[in-house]
Amino acid sequence: MNKISRKGFLKIAAAAAMSGVTAGALAACESASSAASSAVSSGAGSVAAGATYIPGTYEGTAQGISSTVKVTMTFSETAVTDVVVDTSGETASYGAAAADELRQQLLEAGSAEIDGVSGSTITSDAVMKAAQSCYAQAKGEAVVTSVQLPSGDENDWLGTEPDIDEAAITETWDTDIVIVGAGNGGMCAAAYAAQKGLNFRIIEQNSAVMETRHWYGTIDSSEAQKQGVPPVDRAELLSEISRSMGGRCDQRVVKTWIDESAAMHDFVAGILESAPYNYTCNLTLGDEAKWPDDTQISQTKLMFPVQQVDYSSAEKPRNVVFQEYIESLGYAVDFHTGLAKLEKDGDGRITGLIAQNTEDGHFIRINASQGVLLACGGYAGNPYMMEKLDPLGTSVTTACSYAPADKGYGIRAAIWAGAHLDAEAAPVLFDRGLVAPGVDSGYVESASSFGGKAFPGTVGQYNPGSQPFLKVNRHGERFMNESQEYDNASHASFQQPGHVYAMIHDANFREDVDRFHTIGCSALTRYIPGMMESQLEQYEAEGLIMKADTIEELADKMGFAGADKDTFIATVQRYNELYDAQKDEDFGKPASRLSAIRTAPFYGCWLGASLLCSLQGISITPNCQAKDDRNEPIPGLYVTGDMSGSFFQNNYPCVMGGTACGRTLTFAIKAIKQMAGLE
């Protein structure tokens, strides 16, 4: 048992005080501590008369969204003379890319209070906390260090529930409902609870609401009816989802989404489409919800129900709107407040939780008379859990597009309290993990990343990777029908060297993409003008896209040599023959998805999977109540979002756009209704 006591904190503080450091905050619900720690590289003593700082170089660290952020600052007696910001372990296109701007802001500000970088709020906050540590050291002041909740390790991803001494709990909140996590599920639940005037608190360990997933699936929504869309065959939809899950789902749980998602949309629309927002709903329908006819003839029939709606063109994302909405009704998100452990009574009922303020470290008991809703996300950002729970998904992944804060703490806390985790992994993999030649799938060492590991790709998602161009392995061999669901290509690559494959096309890619007419998010390559063209240019400059005037030259640039090069050239020739015949005799790809490779310049790239999220979660009832190992409901504990189970198994049916987020929002409302006795 991880004992965290008042005495323990005092011991830490006493020991730290000898080196000018005091005890501080813990981590919670999806990431490690956000408090800063420090180490003095040079410089010592006290501030001289007439001086502001003790000259020297000081280092501060703080937990960002996916890694430990480090700031190193050099001081003269009166000013900061140099700053180094290391955010290399953060999200590549956001926090990691913000280092130079954050460095410049620190140099110009003369303090740790800077504006930060838009889109990188959590990374910016971490940089400011690390800089505060440097300033404190340079002034000879005490510096906050961190104590972390159990994060698990490569041998034990679950870890042990912390044992928190009563004396360490210095604050108590009494409420009816506690919502843990201010993401898609948590914010929807909070908005619904606020509209109903319920007594609730919502806590979030980070400093802002989490990223909005704009697209969500609804069945027979009012928007679909307004557009004249025929009703969905619900029995067929249920059967198709169950088939996709190999029968491992709880069909009653799936039916909760099917039957109640329309009402969920009406609730969301009632806020987003009303003043002061007046946003317009977009419904995916018509040709955008349908693959070409020959894909339904040449392949097993797949169902594409008209269900996905979004407000992606709105000025503010949905989670921010929900935050403003609950604030207008007198509620607020308790930021910097993270889950430490759930609490239950002698009968096994969840009575609330213990949280910790991640800024100053004090513990809070939150009593919840009606229940706790966990909406903490999955475990995609936790390599310990990924490697043990989803070895196949981990082994075929080259890049990440997940929320790095999703480290599975909510799942672990639920299991500690007696909840059951679904037996099978369910990663959401996109065939868009762009990497350089010679790079294998799977983790690589990354000292600044959580768990010391990260995926090698620097591009979150290369959207054109989902286009059904020719794809070959490292021996130059074609090995599949490329016209598949997003994760199929990634799973197929598990049987190939390095678990990666190459995608090849020629200069006529624009005509090909239009004819392919892929749907869902892969359609962005088709209907955003110049998107693929600009990405080809950008990633060629970065050494991730190869461009050549001949197939032989392309083979060399892609890394094919010897017999593999000969095979690659022969494969391209064979593929052209199949295109000319308009019949794929090798793998049965529909004719509309074939393409010629004859017009220079020729392009090639290497791909693996891009991991969006994990959907292996806590088993739940149709009322979204967590279940124990005997499949009995746990009183007082409810779950939604990526950490909820009983729905997705093995994979995500990506041809049914928005299903995961639609389920998240629907279950969030369902859980609130159940806890509050509204149904």
List the predicted regions and their residue ranges.
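N-terminal secretory signal peptides and thylakoid transit peptides that target proteins
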Residues: 1-20, 24-28
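Active-site- and interface-proximal helix/loop "cap" or "latch" segments in soluble metabolic
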Residues: 48-149
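Beta1/beta-strand and adjacent pyrophosphate-binding region of the FAD-binding site
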Residues: 168-183
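Glycine-rich FAD pyrophosphate-binding loop
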Residues: 195-212
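Conserved redox-cofactor binding core of oxidoreductases
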Residues: 259-362, 383-384, 443-446, 578-599
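Glycine-rich loop(s) and the adjacent beta-strand/alpha-helix scaffold that form part
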Residues: 359-361, 367-439, 655-657, 661-670
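An anion/pyrophosphate-binding glycine-rich loop and adjacent beta-alpha core
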Residues: 411-413, 420-560
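A glycine-rich dinucleotide-binding beta-alpha-beta segment and adjacent secondary-structure elements
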Residues: 566-651
